[in-house]
Amino acid sequence: METKKTLREGYTTGACATAATKAALTALITGIIQTEATIYLPVGRWATFAIEACEIYGESVKATVIKDGGDDPDATHGAAIVSTVSWAEQPGIHLDGGKGVGRVTKPGLPVPVGEAAINPIPRKMIHETAREVLEQYGISRGVNVIISVPNGEEIAKKTLNARLGIIGGISILGTRGIVIPFSTSAYRASIIQAIQVAKANGCDHVVITTGGRSEKFAMRQYPHLPEEAFIEMGDFVGFTLKQCKRLGIRTVSMVGMMGKFSKVAQGIMMVHSKSAPIDFSFLAAIAEQAGASPELVAAVREANTASQVGEMMQEAGNERFFEILCDHCCLSALREVGGGMTVETSLYTMGGQLLGKAVRNDAGD
């Protein structure tokens, strides 16, 4: 019998930056090149990091850790996370971002506008670790710590940073210090952050999409909305809707395709392919309501995929089917959040043709 392989955890960019800082500061104090650094992670355990490079330049030291995403590598997997530490004229620990670490240009993020995109917990980790090293050696001098990512600007193109107003590089992130393989918490956190940025930039209408292709169609449909109003929710329909409601978004437009939106119409709010099957009897009932022939209704009931149903209804020229399906999506969304907002739904083909749309205002409309 095949045994399930245990997935290997990785480390966050914040943990890598902290380990690199510890190595660089230790080398600056002792003059000894460091090959590893052990730090305490927020998750409550110690971890030892290999130091890829440790270069001493008299009054400053540069140490590098290679980011290891474990068995769930993201865009930053394999990136060099560099900490350059030097003595400061002022007391205290002065942390900033260098080349390849983004700058915050829009409100709504946990870091103020104008500062390096080093999130609060990595900041705290770096400060505390640097303080511990200074105390260990009985040193009271101030230090400058610059975190850089040589290829950060390129890597950032594969992330949502530009949309969130983080320009020039990646963010130094991580609340736990470790990356749990295929956990959804990071994706959910990015959805919340995107809604917060939209809200902080004056958007009370956001467009939530199931992926990049849907988003492209949505941007064409809503050209008047700013870029930060568009949020990729992936499979997390219910979660995203609830966060929009919680954060005071008044109008939510959902844009997607047959496969996932057939599930939303049924009231399924987590639309991963393995989350729940599509109810073809439900789609057949909509086809009947839309005036489809008995033969077409029977064919819908026997279909294999929602896309196939979409093609059948298109060939039959039955636009009403798509309008009713979109209306069901709106009703499901309003039920999920308990009303109190306007919900629009637009349904597209894979090629970008608008099949139908609907709008519902509040729960009882």
Curated annotation (Swiss-Prot):
It is an enzyme of class 2 (transferase). Keywords: Cobalamin biosynthesis, Methyltransferase, S-adenosyl-L-methionine, Transferase. It catalyses: Co-precorrin-5B + S-adenosyl-L-methionine = Co-precorrin-6A + S-adenosyl-L-homocysteine. One of its GO terms (molecular function) is cobalt-precorrin-5B C1-methyltransferase activity. SUPFAM superfamilies: CbiD-like. Pathway: Cofactor biosynthesis; adenosylcobalamin biosynthesis; cob(II)yrinate a,c-diamide from sirohydrochlorin (anaerobic route): step 6/10. This is Cobalt-precorrin-5B C(1)-methyltransferase. Belongs to the CbiD family. Gene3D superfamilies: CbiD-like. Pfam families: CbiD. GO terms for biological process: anaerobic cobalamin biosynthetic process; methylation. It comes from the Bacteria. PANTHER family: COBALT-PRECORRIN-5B C(1)-METHYLTRANSFERASE.
